[in-house]
Amino acid sequence: MHTGKLVFAQLMDHLPLHTFRRCVAKYPGRYPTLTFSHLDQFLCMAFAQLTYRESLRDIETCLRAHSAKLYHLGIRGGIARSTLADANENRDWRIYQDFALSLIQTARKLYAKDSFGLELTHTVYALDSTTIDLCLALFPWARFRKHKGAVKLHTLLDLQGNIPAFIHISDGKLHDVNILDQIAFEAGSFYVMDRGYIDFARLYALHLAQAFFVTRAKSNLQYRRVYSHPIDETTGLRCDQTIVLTGPRPRQDYPVQLRRVKFYDANHDKLLVFLTNNFDLPALTIAQLYRCRWQVELFFKWIKQHLRIKAFFGTSQNAVKTQLWIAIAVYVLVAILKKRLKSDASLYTILQILSLTLFEKTSLIQLVINAAPNPEKPQMSNQLNLFDEISGQ
């Protein structure tokens, strides 16, 4: 039953505060917390994400305009942009990383039985990165090129619910393939990635972990065909081969057989060649798995459009990582809310509702239920439409 709480407070009721306190205790610092706690900092930054604030002054102005409601938002400390700036600058960003990761664990359990379009018993992950440009003059620690700064957001997306299972924030110079060294591969799971992650020594390590990969083959791949499996060309398949690598270095790095699947995309008149270490799934399913990689592209597009990760409230590495991890925590929190309330509304729709109603004393459950699409007017799915963009890779 609705208790008359503000919508913002109802949303934050879904936060595991005991977990948050453990994260804070794990990274003690010297920054004073008596008048502006870590939770105050998180709530202010979450408010900024949910209401699309553009600057610290913007956050301060909006919250001071509602100063009588701050207590009911859960914010106990006084609001000043200098205080928030100092907190972002000095409080360890790993507090918010660990808290976001704990929310991710909760969300993945909630979405564990969701389907992503393919009937598989395996967990399927899509791996990719996105670059967030920064002004080198303001962010000198984030040097990317001679006159350009950037950070990279490396993400392993669990396609059941589109929940990030692994996130790493690095400077823009870190090559994507190095991220494979930091992932604990799960036996029996699939890892779908583009050609930028092809390093046969690392892929062989994934193979030895009894996990599976699906990737695009490079045009200069040197190999020898061992066997050709029968195919149905009416499905778009052109070959399903067992191969071994013949290049001196690749042959040494990946000494066992691979599977090579060629698929013709009639819509774009393009041949796509895939490599995998899985020999059990149908060849067409391998091609369909790679198409699912576009879910991680959608994830990056979504958070860049709907969360504040391109305009930063601080310039230090600590402040930037704090803002990014709180943005991720907000994304996952909304995903948790959606599942717990059993809502058919999209995350985008829920975010739009929250941005307009945070200071209202309306039932959050009712708001989300009313936002669900009318079953008599089915919504078009962007998910399948995005599969067509495979021709761009």
Regions found by a protein language model. Name each.
Residues 95-107:
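Short Lys/Arg-enriched helix C-cap and helix-to-coil transition segments
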Residues 72-91, 101:
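Major-groove recognition helix of helix-turn-helix-like DNA-binding domains
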Residues 82-86, 107-111, 372-377:
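Short alpha-helical linear motifs
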Residues 107-116, 177:
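A short, well-structured juxtamembrane/interface segment
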Residues 1-58, 62, 91, 98-99, ...:
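Single, function-defining residue in the core of a domain
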Residues 68-70:
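Active-site cofactor/substrate anionic-group-binding motifs, chiefly glycine-
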Residues 72-73, 112-114, 141-144, 180:
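Catalytic micro-motifs at enzyme active sites that drive phosphoryl/nucleotidyl and oxygen chemistry
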